[in-house]
Amino acid sequence: MRSLDAARDTCERLHPGLIKALEELPLLEREAEGSPVLDIFRAHGGAGLLVPSAYGGHGADALDAVRVTRALGACSPSLAAAATMHNFTAAMLFALTDRVIPPTDEQKKLLARVAPEGMLLASGWAEGRTQQDILNPSVKATPVDDGFILNGSKKPCSLSRSMDILTASVILPDETGQQSLAVPLIMADSPGISVHPFWESPVLAGSQSNEVRLKDVHVPEKLIIRGTPDDPGRLDDLQTATFVWFELLITSAYVGAASALTELVMERDRGSVTDRAALGIQLESAVGLTEGVARAVRDGVFGEEAVAAALTARFAVQKTLAAISDQAIELLGGIAFIKSPELAYLSSALHPLAFHPPGRTSSSPHLVEYFSGGPLEI
């Protein structure tokens, strides 16, 4: 398929050999619990996609990022979901370094290791809870000498067994005593961090979405990124940008899975040409929406406009994916469905987009307010 080939070409340019290495494993092995896809991703430079070139990464723009994610989703939906968590976290952390005055030496040294060493970033935020903000604090921090003690849990937490750094959002007092959002950088091997089984579905099991618990985990002050008196709103601004990255990338991951199903229909000439054209139109409308927002972000659209565009695309695509699944499975036929468990898997793998925050119900009043000329508050 033309547009999927373009996505694969982008992935090959930025992560040479990654798709080929993944395809050496059967789909269901790629998707299973204990799958090596994250090791393969790490070995082929996957960690550096959104890391700036100054830190040894690719510094990819939004369009390249959604295309890479789509290519991964067509090959391994589990990996695409996990890669989204790493990449949107990287996008936020490295955006923060541009506005920290100055970043601590420890922060710079740690972030400079991400791309060269293939360090994977997990997020301790709310991306698995539909009706919440993705950056809703999920960890409590207690001040101690030289830092804070963190307690809490995140479930599900993708990359739980492969992460090198866990990030979280916490509410801490600033120099004036005001409560503000801060982001601690927590080494995954810190005493007090443990991983526990949580994900029981076979769908997306390869994303390692288990429970991560923090019990009396010490994080030094020098590894806490927080607001500054001369720029108190910087974290709020960056939350908006991070929100857009998350929605674009997670949508692209599921568009990739839909692309794999559609490609099978095209390759097997299933149904009439009119049927295949209708399916292709459904898919390409989802691709066009996602890539259109990515182009806008690349070209400078930001703030409320970018958030509204990303959410509009995400919810429109979410509805389209269900139609693509139904139509593709019908065209591929009952015998194919019975004989090929991969088809049932791919069809099921399109639906979890609806479970990522924010939920359509909770977002609706805010979108209506924005569509009617008011501000957008998510």
Swiss-Prot record:
SUPFAM superfamilies: Acyl-CoA dehydrogenase C-terminal domain-like, Acyl-CoA dehydrogenase NM domain-like. InterPro entries: Acyl-CoA_Oxase/DH_mid-dom_sf, AcylCo_DH-like_C, AcylCoA_DH/ox_N, AcylCoA_DH/ox_N_sf, AcylCoA_DH/oxidase_NM_dom_sf. GO terms for molecular function: acyl-CoA dehydrogenase activity; flavin adenine dinucleotide binding. One of its GO terms (biological process) is antibiotic biosynthetic process. Keywords: Antibiotic biosynthesis, FAD, Flavoprotein, FMN, Oxidoreductase. It comes from Streptomyces viridifaciens. It catalyses: 2-methylpropan-1-amine + FADH2 + O2 = N-(2-methylpropyl)hydroxylamine + FAD + H2O + 2 H(+); 2-methylpropan-1-amine + FMNH2 + O2 = N-(2-methylpropyl)hydroxylamine + FMN + H2O + 2 H(+). The lineage of its organism: Bacteria, Bacillati, Actinomycetota, Actinomycetes, Kitasatosporales. Exists in dimeric or trimeric form depending upon buffer conditions. It can form an isobutylamine N-hydroxylase two component enzyme system formed of a flavin reductase component (VlmR) and a monooxygenase component (VlmH). The keyword Signal does not apply. Its EC number is 1.14.14.30. This is Isobutylamine N-hydroxylase. Involved in the biosynthesis of the azoxy antibiotic valanimycin, which has an antitumor activity. Catalyzes the oxidation of isobutylamine to isobutylhydroxylamine via the formation of a flavin 4a-hydroperoxide. Unlike other known N-hydroxylases, isobutylamine N-hydroxylase cannot carry out the reduction of the flavin cofactor and requires the NADPH-flavin oxidoreductase VlmR. Also able to oxidize propan-1-amine, butan-1-amine, butan-2-amine and benzylamine. It has a similar activity with either FMNH(2) or FADH(2). The gene is vlmH. Inhibited by 5',5'-dithio-bis(2-nitrobenzoic acid) (DTNB) and 4-(hydroxymercuri)benzoic acid (p-HMB). It holds the Pfam family Acyl-CoA_dh_N.
